Amino acid sequence: EKHVIQINDTHPTLVIPELMRILLDVEGYSWNDAWNIVTHTVAYTNHTVLAEALERWPQGLIENLLPRIWQILKEIAARYQRTLEQHFHGDQSKVSKMAIIWNGEVRMANLCVCACYAVNGVSALHSEILKQDVFHDAYTMRPEQFKNVTNGVDHRRWLSQINPKLDALVKECTGGDDYLLHPEAIRGLEKYKDDQSVLSQLEAIKKENKRRFAAYV
């Protein structure tokens, strides 16, 4: 209810069975309750339809290195396959295309589509390609799952909340916190591009942030 785990492309997809493992083995949840939490917590963004973002891993690699994760993956895949066969009335062309484990491979993108409550591309065109081509059969099953979210960084979180000293300088130079709701107000900084006092403050803030980060690391 309070947190989301965002999967950016398929590289971190094993977070899905790992979260299941924690909920099952550490927290003692039943399978259904754990799966309910996972499928309301994890979301998936696909940035490109190239193979590098639609990873497939040899099942033997996962089985040997992560045996408990493999057990959980097999159960997720088996349950999902039963759902697919029921939904598509045994159409094996669609079932095989959407299967999580097939021909000795674990298909990470299909695992994301199975488990994530939201799937999005990063532009209107890209999102349409996902719906009409890459994940078309999944889209016909759960059209509400597929969304379009433009990629970007939100200044309220990544500037105001996380960098309070820079936030204070921006507010001082632009006349208050108007930029939080109207980011175009940041253009007010342009008039200080040759102001050595402001530039010195900016440099000092950057150095201090780097020192704090280095100390943390």
Segments from the language model and where they lie:
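A conserved ligand/cofactor-binding region detector
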Residues: 1-217
